[in-house]
Curated annotation (Swiss-Prot):
This is Zinc finger C3HC-type protein 1. Residues 52-72, 327-338, 351-360 have a biased composition (Polar residues). Changing residue 137 to F: Does not strongly affect phosphorylation status. It is found in: Nucleus; Nucleus envelope. Phosphorylated. May also be weakly phosphorylated on Tyr residues. Required for proper positioning of a substantial amount of TPR at the nuclear basket (NB) through interaction with TPR. The modification Phosphothreonine is found at residues 28, 84, 333, 384, 387. One of its GO terms (molecular function) is protein kinase binding. Residues 371-380, 407-422 have a biased composition (Low complexity). PANTHER family: NUCLEAR-INTERACTING PARTNER OF ALK (PTHR15835), ZINC FINGER C3HC-TYPE PROTEIN 1 (PTHR15835:SF6). The keyword Transmembrane does not apply. The lineage of its organism: Eukaryota, Metazoa, Chordata, Craniata, Vertebrata. A zinc finger (C3HC-type) spans 102-156.
């Protein structure tokens, strides 16, 4: 009885071995693929990563099947490619060869007029030779536009899977996203406080930004802050510093924001989220200096601007530039008594005079300054005949210089210009160009409708924001409305304009 059992067991074993031999050709490619993955895949991926890669390869048949979904659909990766197109490397190109179009197909700049694919590492020379023949120039532009797709390697995914068009467009068809991004930009700009740039009233009139429009936008921001959580609502309060809020509101409408990645650099920089342009505010007139000049010229030191008297004591956020850091240290050496005796208009004006003035009289050396009342070695050397130890509070020459520096020819006014929110963008930026909505793009339109007025992107966003506010405007009003506050700010702008023109 034992022999049949042993025979059956032998037959079963032979059948198993034969089945294994039969199935071995089917399992060999999978085994080889696993061995290859063990040498290429990172160790922290583990077994799950190998199984996922094997599954994607068995289904799609390509190891790069999931790469397009990770890089071409990433908005952060898209704008990181756009950021490589600096003005030195990519200049003088038409709109159809803008960095937004090049980054859509995976290109970055490595040298002047030299593109490189971020995936297949292919190179493309995009130089435009100066030509007097306009047709030849247009032909060259068309060739380069076509080469953005054809210059990739054979198995590169960018020609078949470019980034979405919406990355390089303003979301004009989605008002909720516009309002949310508008509030985020406003909150980030308010962190700069008095370091925000001063705006010229003529530029605001050119942009058709009236007091009523600014008031509606401030009401919209206040309503959106009320809908946010309490943690985010405490960061910004619209009850104080109305001049800062009006400036931040105008800049955020035009697409400017204070990037969070720049806070560690301790610099007052604002950036555009579309053209990735960064602007240092130390090169422009700032609210801090304008308020100081305004108070000194109109005698407003005894009656401060509403909203500033309740400000908590704050440390200076960041020095505007290395030059401002040195001038701040020079101001600390001067005593308040001497400054009051000399009737200085303000610390900002004195800093600018001591550093930027072309006259050698207005350039005191840092080691010559002392905490005590200053002497007059410079005026004595010019022939006044004073003794070195004689202490005088001021001199006629200094008074004359200070009166002249309050005019429009002062170094502070001439060296620092006003910030224009629209002209600081790059010429291909969607904020200053005519932007098509999603419906127009889906219909295949490349030009705006002739019946609709041609408006730049920031003005289209402004129209949508105002319409969104007017559609949901509440009936109740505050005791001191924001429109009244904004009119006070514009009155300050007009006074400052008359100050600069005197």
């Amino acid at each position: 009885m034992a022999a049949p059992c042993e025979g059956q067991a032998f037959a079963v074993g032979v059948e198993k071995n034969w089945g294994a031999v039969v199935r071995s050709p089917e399992g060999t490619p999978q085994k080889i693929r696993q061995l290859i993955d063990e040498g290429i895949a990172p160790e922290e991926g583990g077994v799950d990563a190998k199984d996922t890669s094997a599954t994607s390869q068995s289904v799609n048949g390509s190891p790069q099947a999931e790469q397009p979904s990770l890089e071409s659909t990433s908005k952060e990766a898209f704008f990181s490619r756009v950021e490589t197109f600096s003005s030195l490397k990519w200049a003088g190109k038409p709109f159809e060869l803008s960095p937004l179009v090049c980054a859509k197909y995976g290109w970055v700049t490595v040298e002047c007029d030299m593109l490189k694919c971020s995936s297949c590492q292919a190179f493309l020379c995009a130089s435009l030779q100066p030509a007097f023949d306009f047709d030849r120039y247009k032909q060259r532009c068309a060739e380069l536009k076509k080469a953005l797709c054809t210059a990739h390697e054979k198995f590169c995914f960018w020609p078949d899977s470019p980034s979405p068009d919406r990355f390089g467009m303003l979301p004009l068809d989605e008002p909720a996203i516009l309002v949310s991004e508008f509030l985020d930009r406003f909150q980030s700009l308010c962190h700069l406080d008095l370091q925000l740039p001063s705006l010229r009233p003529e530029d605001l009139k050119t942009m058709c930004l009236t007091e009523d429009k600014i008031s509606l936008l401030l009401h919209l921001l206040e309503d959106e802050l009320d809908h946010r959580t309490d943690e985010r609502k405490t960061t910004i309060k619209l009850g104080s510093d109305i001049q800062v809020h009006v400036t931040a509101c105008i800049l955020s409408v035009c697409g400017w924001a204070c990037s969070s990645s720049l806070e560690s650099m301790q610099l007052s920089l604002i950036t555009c989220s579309q053209c990735m342009r960064k602007v240092g505010l130390w090169g422009f007139q700032q609210i801090e200096s304008s308020m100081t000049d305004l108070d000194a010229s109109f005698g407003l030191t005894s009656s401060p601007i509403p909203g500033l008297e309740g400000r908590p004591e704050r440390l200076p956020l960041v020095p505007e530039s290395p030059r401002r850091m040195m001038t701040r240290s020079q101001d600390a050496t001067f005593s308040p008594g001497s400054e009051q005796a000399e009737k200085s208009p303000g610390p900002i004006v004195s800093r600018t005079r001591s550093w930027d003035s072309s006259s050698p009289v207005d350039r005191p050396e840092p080691e010559a300054a002392s905490p005590t009342t200053r002497t007059r070695p410079v005026t004595r050397s010019m022939g006044t005949g004073d003794t070195p130890g004689l202490e005088v509070p001021s001199s006629p020459l200094r008074k004359a210089k200070r009166a002249r520096l309050c005019s429009s020819s002062s170094s502070d006014t001439s060296s620092r210009s006003f910030f224009d929110p629209t002209s600081q963008h790059r010429d291909w930026c969607p904020w200053v160009n005519i932007t098509l909505g999603k419906e127009s793009r889906e219909n295949g339109g490349t030009e705006p409708d002739a019946s609709a007025p041609a408006e730049p992107g920031w003005k289209a966003v402004l129209t949508i924001l105002l319409a969104h506010k007017q559609s949901s405007q509440p009936a109740e009003t505050d005791s001191m409305s924001l429109s009244e506050k904004s009119r006070k700010v514009f009155r300050i702008f007009r006074q400052w304009e008359s100050l600069c023109s005197c």
